[in-house]
Design a protein with these regions (language model features):
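Metallo-beta-lactamase
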Residues: 2-4, 87-161
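Structural motif
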Residues: 61, 85, 165-166, 191
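Cap/insert and terminal regions of metallo-dependent hydrolase folds
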Residues: 83-86, 171-199
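Active-site HxH/HxHxD metal-binding segment of metal-dependent hydrolases
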Residues: 47-116, 133
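Conserved beta-strand hairpin/beta-sheet module of binuclear metal-dependent hydrolase folds
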Residues: 2-49, 147-169
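Divalent metal-coordination and catalytic microenvironments
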Residues: 19, 29, 64, 71, ...
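Active-site metal-binding loops of divalent metal-dependent hydrolases
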Residues: 30-32, 65, 129-130, 168-170, ...
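Pre-active-site segment of Zn-dependent metallo-hydrolases
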Residues: 21-61, 72-77, 134-138, 172-185
Length: 199
């Protein structure tokens, strides 16, 4: 791995994070298009310099298919050489299909809980969904309904850094916490959802 220790991390908005390391510019869960979800959701505070947020992008990680984490309108402006990394769970094949339709071909479906080298200086490990609904309510435990868990997180490791980005992957189910606790040993930065609905 590279000997460079410098890493820059910017929280652009919501779960949208920009990470600069060596020759990589990684965007996680890019979202800047206002009016998603029937014009109800807006980027706040507003991001006025979109070019600055996405300039130089080389890699993108998308944790799940929701529009506040997967903004196809924004991603159509990325270079066609951009490499995309998506957890290989249902329904993320739809993300891959839409990216193909936009002209992107460097799309990698990542297995859960497995270290995947991104070049020679970075490793991704997808954290599995730790919730069904993402709602903070005891009634969900009692509900006789099974949701479709899709909110994944990312553990990003370099030779000098360990960063965990949970996005919307709220750790509600305690049976998953032992594995997560082991992964987070000596983590440098942990990004958690600030409520049960959005990161």
């Amino acid at each position: 791995m590279s000997r460079n220790k410098d890493i820059k991390i910017y929280n652009i908005s919501n779960a949208f994070v920009r990470i600069e390391y060596n020759d990589k510019v990684l965007l996680c869960d890019p979202w800047l298009t206002n009016g998603i979800f029937d014009k109800a959701w807006m980027v706040y505070p507003p991001v006025y310099d979109v070019d600055k947020a996405i300039n130089g992008v080389t890699h993108v990680f998308i944790s799940h298919i929701h529009k506040d984490h997967c903004d196809f309108n924004l991603m159509r402006h990325f270079p066609k050489t951009t490499e995309f990394y998506i957890p290989d769970i249902f329904p993320n094949d739809k993300i891959k299909l839409q990216l193909n339709n936009l002209g992107f071909n460097n799309i990698h479906m990542l297995p859960i809980n497995k270290d995947i080298s991104i070049g020679s200086d970075m490793v991704f490990n997808v954290i599995p969904p730790m919730n069904m609904y993402g709602h903070e309510t005891e009634e969900m435990v009692k509900a006789n309904i099974n949701g479709v868990p899709l909110d994944c997180g990312l553990l990003l490791t370099t030779e000098f850094h360990k960063i965990c980005i949970l996005a919307d992957d709220s750790p509600y189910y305690f049976d998953h916490l032992t594995d997560l606790h082991e992964k987070l040993n000596k983590v440098d930065l942990l990004m958690l959802p600030y409520n049960g609905y959005a990161a």
